[in-house]
Amino acid sequence: MKITALEGQKISELSMIEVAHALLEQNGKEMQFSEIIRAIQDYLEKSDDEIKASISRFYTEINTDGSFIPLGNNIWALRSWYAIDEIDEEVIALDEIEDEEEEKPAKKRKKVNAFGIEDEIDPEDEEGTKETTEEDMSYDTQAEDEDKDDVAAYDAELAEVELDNVDEEVDIDVEDDEDDSDDTDED
């Protein structure tokens, strides 16, 4: 293979990027990445092992070099072949496609109860389903029952007490403390 743009230069001093640029310029059309690699290997007379060792560095360089443009499906061309407006439109078109994909409504996810299944039976909620024993009662329930028992016992004791010398009609006069103090001062 002969590349006219590189005539007169030492092949051993040429980089793969320089050869790829001259190759695309001479062909005047887009090329597959694999075709570019084969043509570079033939022109630089490199072995398969040498190409395999340098292919990742070359791919990085072709991506970062501003003179190449990827057209998709691993097809490459020279950026100078395309007007700036065309390149911007292609980029905008890709952005619009990405935006349309993002606008698709996402599937609604089912809400998950982080604390377990809602239908799970809680034994504390089933107080009325079995007879409660003293062991099952809480402290508050026991104290309330004991208070009722104490009041009933006190009332029973009061009923049994006989009051001696109690008149049926008892008048209770409520006097002010001030009146009492006045009465005592006068005496």
UniProtKB/Swiss-Prot annotation:
Pfam families the record matches: HARE-HTH (PF05066)
UniProt entry keywords in alphabetical sequence: DNA-directed RNA polymerase, Nucleotidyltransferase, Transcription, Transferase
Disulfide-bonded cysteines: none
Complexes and interactors: RNAP is composed of a core of 2 alpha, a beta and a beta' subunits. The core is associated with a delta subunit and one of several sigma factors.
GO MF assignments: DNA-directed RNA polymerase activity
Designated name of the protein: Probable DNA-directed RNA polymerase subunit delta
Highest taxon above the source species: Bacteria
Organism expressing this protein natively: Lactococcus lactis subsp. lactis (strain IL1403) (Streptococcus lactis)
Keyword Phosphoprotein assigned: no
